């Protein structure tokens, strides 16, 4: 599992967190994250690109992207609203995995594994759509 490092491709033109093509899954502990990553790897659902985000990483790298924009770009605010949810959970010690989304079938298989561990939120970032996977 890779450590997360924010990249421009994970941001909107406004600079807000929006990792298109990824599932963003928050779990209550590092133990749950490791259990999930192991299940994904053993089922060949992890291509080695799954990223771990500790609560500190979420607070330091993801949270500051909310509200970076000025008034020059329109937005419905969904991106910032999601980041605020992530912030609240990170403050409680939750961490996250970012998993490549792939096809609908791949996503279903990943979510079958996600549901084997306690998880707090699961979102799939697609082009122009954040899909709630709960």
Where are these regions (language model features)?
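Positively charged, small/polar-rich N-terminal and surface patches that mediate targeting and assembly
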Residues: 1-134
């Amino acid at each position: 599992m890779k450590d997360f490092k924010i990249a421009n491709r994970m941001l909107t033109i406004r600079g807000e967190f929006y990792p298109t093509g990824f599932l963003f899954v928050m779990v209550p502990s590092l133990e749950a994250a490791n259990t999930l990553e192991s299940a994904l790897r053993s089922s060949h659902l992890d291509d080695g690109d799954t990223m771990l985000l500790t609560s500190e990483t979420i607070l330091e790298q993801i949270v500051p992207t909310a509200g970076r924009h000025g008034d020059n770009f329109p937005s419905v605010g969904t991106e910032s609203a999601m980041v605020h949810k992530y912030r609240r959970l990170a403050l409680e010690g939750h961490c996250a995995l970012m998993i490549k989304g792939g096809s609908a079938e791949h996503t279903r298989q990943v979510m079958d594994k996600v549901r084997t561990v306690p998880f707090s939120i699961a979102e799939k970032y697609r082009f122009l759509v954040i899909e709630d996977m709960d």
